[in-house]
Amino acid sequence: MLKVPLSDVLSQKMLFLKSFRYFHCTKYFSRDNASSTTDIFRNAMKRKRELANLKEQSHGNVARNAAFPKEYIKRPKQVPRNATNRKKILITWSTGTDRAKEAANSVVSEIFKKNHKGNIKVVDPTTHRIEASNIRYFAKGIDLDKVGLSIVNVEQIDNENQIPLVKIVESRVALKKYSDFLAKKKEKELMELGVLNKSYKNLVTDKKEDNLKHIKISWQIESDDLKRQKAHEIVSLLKKGNKVTLYLDDKNNINSNNWLENFEELDRSQKGEPPRLPESVFQKRAAVLETLKEIVSEYANDPVLLGNMNSKMIMKLIPKDVKPQNNDKRALKELRKKERQEKLQKRIQRKKMNEM
């Protein structure tokens, strides 16, 4: 009989037990827990397949839109065309003083604010027609020692873009307009800082502007409107002691945004005469001017006329008498009564002259 040492037997048993030391049977496999185990496995496999399909769909254009709707896709916002942080476009001027260059650059900057491409409309000095252009090309060759730029009107194209109407004016006119622009800008800054009160601004404007009234009249105005509405407006201002300036021009020009700038050059003598109008148009304008003279003859001194009927005119009116204060009601009534009597006498005299 083979005898095995007891130590060898014990060591073999220990090796056999060590091979099963990591196996722990905590729950028996039965019908009750089989369904739950299967569900866990099935859900895990289902989730794995969904992730795989989603990954494949993300590589396709059509499937990608289905997997990621547009509302969940973040795209960088596009910068609008007329953004304020756009690089400034400067034009180099070879002529003119520093002040003239600043005035021209101010106009160019305003043009690009209204139209980011710099598209403009210009008035041809020879044909007097409005033509399309671009400020980059239009500004070439301009002698700032003699002339300057001015925006006389703005045409609205859409919500973002506008087309300015640019005109070449004398250098002194451009500098005067630029000085006014800087003065208004400085005044606005002082008011924002609280240094300048609105009452001071009103006090200055009261002395300069309140006593001078501006009325624009179209050459195409109807006779009834001129004799009623406009006549009442003009006479009322003259009776109050206000100085009145009448501006007569074509309907298209008088209704523009910067209509007043068209009259800046009438104070100086113009070179050459404007083109002659048809006889019917000229007679219509002559009738308008004569009617205005008749309306203001009783309440204003002899009017000062500038310009001519072929283009535009200015009529400056100064009231004859200074009316008394509002608190002197009796004197005011007597004055109105006297005016009515004088007016009635003139009508009677005109009627007698017509009968003769």
UniProtKB/Swiss-Prot annotation:
One GO location term (cellular component): mitochondrion
Say yes or no: keyword Ribosomal protein present: no
Localization of this protein:
Mitochondrion
Gene Ontology biological-process entries: mitochondrial translational initiation
Q: Which effects follow disruption of this gene? A: Increases frequency of mitochondrial genome loss.
Provide the transit peptide span. Answer: 1-32
Q: Which UniProt keywords apply?
A: Mitochondrion, Transit peptide
Any one Gene Ontology molecular-function term assigned to this protein's record:
translation initiation factor activity
What else does the entry mention about this protein? Present with 319 molecules/cell in log phase SD medium.
Family that this chain belongs to: Belongs to the AIM23 family.
Record protein name field: Altered inheritance of mitochondria protein 23, mitochondrial
Which organism encodes this protein? Answer: Saccharomyces cerevisiae (strain ATCC 204508 / S288c)
